[in-house]
Amino acid sequence: MSLEGRVFAIAGAGGLLGPTVVQRLASKGARLALAGRDKAPLDAIAAEAGGADTVSVDLLDAEATRAWARGIVERHGRVDGLVHLVGGWWPSAPIEDASLEDWRRFHDLLISTYQHTTQAFVPHLLASGRGRVMIVSPGHAQAPTHRNASYAAAKAAAEAWTLALADRFRGTGATANIVVVGAIVTPAMRTESPDKDYATFTPAEEIAQAIAYLCSDDAASMNGQRVTLRGAA
């Protein structure tokens, strides 16, 4: 399952999953372009993976996001995939007390950034002939509780956007898929808390493995799928 010579953009690469996903794709021979709010952690992740392009981008700025996509194509001549790892969570009030401000924050973080990145990259992914789009989504996007209504609604909207992308890609050679996970455990978390029971968590390594598979030609027939990993509710 080689990704040799292919170019992948990773949005939100400085977050929880970034280091593991970057390492996995780099190990398969991919050329990577990393974006996030802060460049310093991206530079560290890139160095650990043997090199990658890094840039600080405000993904809420649609034009800045398009400029990032254009820059990748100018540098590498192509872009073959977008892995959207932008995420975040904070506690919410019960549904009757949930504020519109809470919803707006989740919408900006989880929907607007995703809309901007996909709209910036879709023309290039179609030109690739085998473009890929992936997001990571929690199981409870499809089974929300009253205390995470705004978060779950935003994630469900991101899933719907992905399925709409899959429809756009039908018959083009490009694909869009969703990796469904539970609470995530990273190698760093295991090092920091080695005695904690992570049996019900989704390992970051398995998420990265699923993403690498979906990036490959082996997954060319998978489009509009929810790939559920262990730990997903």
Feature-to-residue mapping (PLM):
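Catalytic loop of short-chain dehydrogenase/reductase
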Residues: 106, 126, 132-171, 183
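Rossmann-fold cofactor-recognition segment
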Residues: 48-63
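C-terminal helical subdomain
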Residues: 171, 178-179, 195-233
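Catalytic Tyr-X3-Lys loop
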Residues: 96-115, 134, 158
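Active-site loop of short-chain dehydrogenase/reductase
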Residues: 6, 78-80, 125-139, 171-175, ...
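Conserved mid-core segment of classical short-chain dehydrogenase/reductases
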Residues: 66, 87-104, 147-150, 190
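Conserved glycine-rich cofactor-binding loop
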Residues: 14-15
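Amphipathic alpha-helical dimer-interface segment in Rossmann-like NAD(P)H-dependent oxidoreductases
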Residues: 70, 109-127, 166-167, 216
